[in-house]
Amino acid sequence: MITGSLVALVTPMYPNGDIHWEDLDKLVDFHIENGTHGIVAVGTTGESATLDPEEHIRTIGHIIKRVNGRIPVIAGTGGNSTREAIELTTEAHKLGADACLLVVPYYNKPTQEGLYQHFKAIAEAVPGMSQILYNVPGRTACDMLNETVVRLADIPNIVGIKDATGNIPRGAELIEALDGRLAVYSGDDATAADLMLAGAKGNVSVTANVAPKAMAELCEAAIAGNEDETRRLNELLMPLNRKLFLEANPIPVKWALYRMGMIGEGIRLPLTPLSEKFHGEVEDALKASGVL
């Protein structure tokens, strides 16, 4: 089972939007050196929506090669087309990804039965790939209910779910209903500590991009049930957990990494660089959390 701090890695870019492969290598090494437990490649934070299929697969492969087995790599291979998701998942499996992250289909708003059949079809098409589901209704306009997740838990290679609802009572109910059949991961930095203390096995984190060591330590403490240490670290990171979402993710976190000297300012349209009026707030959060 993959556990701990799973960074939702940004995809660094040049000002013209081309991928900056050298900066990507630097980020991978930065995370391994600072204790990150796993990397999520080409998810929402990695700008999956604006990478073409060839770039998508190339980026996953590049990260897997750079990691070289040191920590798990989870490949973002979801989509709102089941056929496309199967194709991406198949390619990620060939490249050696340890698992894939499959977002609930967005925009076309399937029913709960449609969601079940979508994830079932991917699992059956790529039976050797461990699959982590991803429910983020704030982005997809489609909410996968706990009952559907419990039903999907019967499929052998579906091994987890990233819960980005931010609803702790609901997440705790899901953990109880699954009874260990799937690992539940937080997908919301601001509430991750509480969900892990309730039994979640890790956090797919935006904040970990800029504070990998502290986030890894928080996840370790929370999973171990050390509430005092979890609360201390959560308080330290809370300014980042809040300010990295002043504009749509990954806009603020890419600017934060730029401010840290880790990457350039490149981001792809329709996303634009962080509004200047928010620069001070993000910089203050970096300082408050001990990053700068």
Curated annotation (Swiss-Prot):
Gene3D superfamilies listed in its UniProt record:
Aldolase class I
Provide the coiled-coil residue spans. none
Q: Which GO terms describe its molecular function?
A: 4-hydroxy-tetrahydrodipicolinate synthase activity
Q: Name the residues annotated as catalytic in the UniProt entry.
A: Y134, K162
Enzyme class, first EC level, given as a word: lyase
Q: Main site of residence?
A: cytoplasm
Q: In which pathway does it act?
A: Amino-acid biosynthesis; L-lysine biosynthesis via DAP pathway; (S)-tetrahydrodipicolinate from L-aspartate: step 3/4
Q: How does it assemble?
A: Homotetramer; dimer of dimers.
Q: What does this protein do?
A: Catalyzes the condensation of (S)-aspartate-beta-semialdehyde [(S)-ASA] and pyruvate to 4-hydroxy-tetrahydrodipicolinate (HTPA).
Similarity comment text for this entry: Belongs to the DapA family.
Record's protein name: 4-hydroxy-tetrahydrodipicolinate synthase
**Source organism per UniProt:** Marinobacter nauticus (strain ATCC 700491 / DSM 11845 / VT8) (Marinobacter aquaeolei)
